[in-house]
Structures are given as structure tokens and as C-alpha cells.
Amino acid sequence: HMGLGQPDFKTPKHVVEAAKKALDDGHHGYVMSNGIPECRQAVTRWIKKRYDVEVDFERILIMPGGKPTMSYAIQCFGEPGAEIIHPTPAFPIYESMINYTGSTSVPYDLTEDKDLKFNADKILSLITDKTRLLILINPNNPTGSFVEKPEIDKLAEGLKKHPHVTILSDEIYSRQI
């Protein structure tokens, strides 16, 4: 199945109840543009628990979903003359936003003979002086494939030679491995 990641389960009851309570408590107006402080603080606690990294909640930005997040990030780095490396097949917003910015789309193919996984050497070979952004997604959407740590480490080591490249790591399904 190579479709979009449409949830096939109900929203958890505690999430539904929290949304109802927020509405009942009168929270139906605009919030701070970077997100509700308590929510941002909760994200810092989650990051600490998951990655053992301290992050100031002032550096956290709450977004209304994956699509606008990807769109804004690609717009930040994309411009005519820039190259953006991205997987294919992948979430359609990547290539459409790259084209919107006037950047050059540089796909790295995820093929069945490689179990739909990226190859670090192939990605590194695509980097030029014009590369501004490298989009990674693991596990991949829509293939469901995921890349093992040794290959990720190999890519990370190779990227040290390219400090001009920013990594956009789409981790929407990372907790499902």
C-alpha cells in the first residue's frame, strides 16, 4: 500500500476528552503563534525522556501538522539555484514544495531491490555545493521501510564533510518501529 498515512484507528479517548475539556473551559480563541507554553514545556519533557537532551521550551515551535511543517521548512531553504535532496517515493509535499520554491529537486530513489531503503553512499554522492537541504524520513512514508542504525551512522559520518547541508528529518512514524 503506497498511499498517504491515513490513521486507521480512533483518536485515543484521553485526547478526545482533553479537547472537549479545553473547549468547555473556554479555550477556543487564538494562542501564541509558537504554541501554548504548557504544551511546549511538555514537549521538552518528552525530548528529555526520549533522547536525554535538554531543550529550552522557548526553542520549541508547535505546528498544526506535518504538511505545513514540511512546507515552511522547504520554503526556508529553497530558492532558485538551490538543490534539495529528497526520497522518492515519499510524501507528495516534498517535491511539490521544492518545485514551488524554484529549487532543483534531487531525488534519491528507494527501490524494491534495496528493500525501499536509502543508501548512504548514494545520498552522499548527490550532494553538491548547491545542496541546501537533505530530507530524510525513517520509517518512510509511504513505503513503511526503515533504515538500520549502521546505515544512518554511515550517512551521519559522511555528512560531517558537508556542513552547508541542513537535514530535515521527518520522524512522523519513528515511534512505530
List the model feature ranges, each with a label.
Residues 1-65, 72:
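N-terminal small-domain helix-loop-helix segment of the aminotransferase-like
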Residues 6-7, 67, 91, 138-142:
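Short glycine-rich anion-binding loops that position phosphate/pyrophosphate groups of nucleotides
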Residues 54-60, 80-83, 130:
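Short acidic capping loops at alpha-helix termini that bridge into adjacent secondary structure
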Residues 65-71, 88-89, 150, 177:
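Short N-terminal helix/helix-N-cap motif within the alpha/beta-hydrolase-1
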Residues 76-98:
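Conserved PLP-anchoring active-site segment centered on the Schiff-base-forming lysine
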Residues 100-105:
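A short helix-loop-beta submotif of the ANL/AMP-binding
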Residues 106, 112-177:
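Active-site phosphate-binding strand-loop segment of PLP-dependent enzymes
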